[in-house]
Design a protein with these regions (language model features):
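FMN-binding flavodoxin-like domain, especially the glycine-rich phosphate-binding loop
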Residues: 58-64, 68, 82-167
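N-terminal beta1-alpha1-beta2 submodule of the flavodoxin-like/Rossmannoid cofactor-binding fold
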Residues: 1-103
């Protein structure tokens, strides 16, 4: 909270406390609008629902915050070497096809991704807490270094959608 207060003195800050919001992390029929109950690829259907303006209000609100953001700060405890399930579910529901990825490069005809995704121009700072110290989480630690542990998030989620991760 202190960080939010400090940043708020110089910047417009929007926060999301997924637990306090009661955010449902499960991507399902409620995210699909008219396509609910129709067999198919959930991610593609969520993208169609986004394009049709049929995503649930809580997802639309999170997308609006992200669309307006220059900097995304993800703060979470490291659970089983990754983000908590509720945050993973936030990625699944909010970073939809056609919003965060999936646009085709007009010259190449292939999806724009890895630094060229739908959220290009935004940056992220990942802040984690862990129950281990540098003897365990470090270059010579049994768990490996933190950069490697976070690679699926920093590269596979953030960079894929165009968000540059700050060191």
């Amino acid at each position: 909270r202190e960080g939010v207060e400090t940043l708020s003195t110089r910047f417009e800050v929007a926060t999301s406390d997924l637990y306090a919001q009661g955010f449902d992390p499960v991507l399902g029929d409620g995210d699909l609008g008219d396509l609910a109950g129709v067999p198919g690829n959930l991610a593609a259907q969520a993208g169609e629902s986004y394009a049709a303006g049929q995503l649930p209000p809580e997802v639309q609100a999170e997308q609006a915050k992200l669309a307006a953001a220059e900097l995304l700060i993800l703060q979470f405890p490291l659970w089983w070497y990754g983000p908590p399930a509720i945050l993973k579910g936030w990625f699944d529901r909010v970073l939809t096809d056609r919003f965060a990825y999936g646009d085709l490069d007009p010259e190449l005809g292939v999806p724009r991704r890895y630094g060229d995704g739908g959220l290009t121009g935004r940056r992220a700072l990942v802040v984690v807490t862990a129950g281990e110290d540098e003897r365990s989480i470090g270059p010579r630690g049994i768990s490996g270094d933190l950069e490697s542990l976070l690679f699926p998030l920093t590269h596979g989620v953030l960079w894929y959608t165009g968000i540059e991760t700050l060191d």
